[in-house]
Amino acid sequence: MTLSGGGSASDMSGQTVLTAEDVDIDVVGEGDDGLEEKDSDAGCDSPAGPPELRLDEADEVPPAAPHHGQPQPPHQQPLTLPKEAAGAGAGPGGDVGAPEADGCKGGVGGEEGGASGGGPGAGSGSAGGLAPSKPKNSLVKPPYSYIALITMAILQSPQKKLTLSGICEFISNRFPYYREKFPAWQNSIRHNLSLNDCFVKIPREPGNPGKGNYWTLDPQSEDMFDNGSFLRRRKRFKRHQQEHLREQTALMMQSFGAYSLAAAAGAAGPYGRPYGLHPAAAAGAYSHPAAAAAAAAAAALQYPYALPPVAPVLPPAVPLLPSGELGRKAAAFGSQLGPGLQLQLNSLGAAAAAAGTAGAAGTTASLIKSEPSARPSFSIENIIGGGPAAPGGSAVGAGVAGGTGGSGGGSTAQSFLRPPGTVQSAALMATHQPLSLSRTTATIAPILSVPLSGQFLQPAASAAAAAAAAAQAKWPAQ
């Protein structure tokens, strides 16, 4: 504070009065009485120095209003502020070493120095607090994740797709923080593009040369941000298409059990199917019919432009079961696999009845139908395992051919047409030849009706009918 001329006394007295009212006089005033008396005795060297006021006189002086333009002194300023200011931050006119010798100059000069020194310091402090804030604001990292930054870049592009360089260019131009630290965050953008399902890679067109693929947003991930705000995502986006296909495949394999799609792949080539075959035909050749139909449907989805399957064009395949296993199947599942066999036996009986006489044909047909049920222990495996029955079935045609030429053929047919179980009974009961004939025909008929394939059923039936007619014609003559 600067003191001058005539108004300095009122200023000094006003300052002293305000300070004395606020500070406890009993505590502060005891040590200052002696100092004030000493200062008054010494006097001030300056001719225009203001007169000193004692504390008892200061109580009677009313406070003076400050001049216009001067700041009002603070109420918390203690009584010894001029000396403290002189000691703490003395200005150019303050003498710190001798405060008692030159109290007026030291006090006034210290106050001037403190005021002059405090002004620029306060200004520089306030200016220093505001000046560094501007560059800091420009370098603040944006509160957006890398996924949000990539989404912003893709959505603002005209074609809604950008390359990696285009995304980095948009982020650098939009945010100065990333512009100054450009090479450090480019790999982070690349990793987020590759590892998140919400971004889809699009290869370049043939007529669009350049480096790098395009990236766009998955159509189902448009609502992954709340209300269009890029500050927060609702949840992590995942594609459910592949999981849905895997669930369908697993369900299909469980429904078919052992006849799964893996049965077709087990016998296929290294690429999952035999060479030169359609997937549907390959699956139908090695798997269950139900699994083949499922494999055909799956192949139609996987190979939409492949050739049509070959399986419907070809005739049904012949069962590759040997005769012994087929006999076991017939014995175990007679009621389920028997309709075709029963139809063939019925047709064989009808042919035999048409070739013979009326009575013999009726007896033969009735015995042919009743013989399998009357003998439940009969099976094809027993006849084939007996030994002579296997070549006997093949020798029927030779016997019949010889019987048409002469009597030697008749004896051959008589010896081979008798089954092993009825040889002794036929020798002992020579008078009952129709019964032995019927038993012979009933015994041979199942052998001829169960060939290795279904292609020889009709020739076997005609051969059996011819053998029965030849035997009936030859045996009454003997």
Swiss-Prot record:
Q: Mind listing the GO molecular function terms for this protein? A: DNA-binding transcription factor activity; DNA-binding transcription factor activity, RNA polymerase II-specific; DNA-binding transcription repressor activity, RNA polymerase II-specific; RNA polymerase II cis-regulatory region sequence-specific DNA binding; RNA polymerase II transcription regulatory region sequence-specific DNA binding; sequence-specific double-stranded DNA binding
Q: Where in the cell is it found?
A: Nucleus
**What residue spans carry the Gly residues bias annotation?**
104-128
InterPro entries with a match to the protein in the record: FH_FOXD3, Fork_head_dom, FOX_domain-containing, TF_fork_head_CS_1, TF_fork_head_CS_2, WH-like_DNA-bd_sf, WH_DNA-bd_sf
Q: Which residues bind DNA?
A: 141-235
List the residue ranges of the region (Disordered).
1-136
Give the superkingdom in one word: Eukaryota
Gene3D superfamilies annotated for this entry? Answer: Winged helix-like DNA-binding domain superfamily/Winged helix DNA-binding domain
Described by its record, this protein's role is as follows: Binds to the consensus sequence 5'-A[AT]T[AG]TTTGTTT-3' and acts as a transcriptional repressor. Also acts as a transcriptional activator. Negatively regulates transcription of transcriptional repressor RHIT/ZNF205. Promotes development of neural crest cells from neural tube progenitors. Restricts neural progenitor cells to the neural crest lineage while suppressing interneuron differentiation. Required for maintenance of pluripotent cells in the pre-implantation and peri-implantation stages of embryogenesis.
Known disease link: Autoimmune disease 1: An autoimmune disorder characterized by the association of vitiligo with autoimmune thyroiditis (Hashimoto thyroiditis).
Q: What is this protein called?
A: Forkhead box protein D3
Organism of this sequence: Homo sapiens (Human)
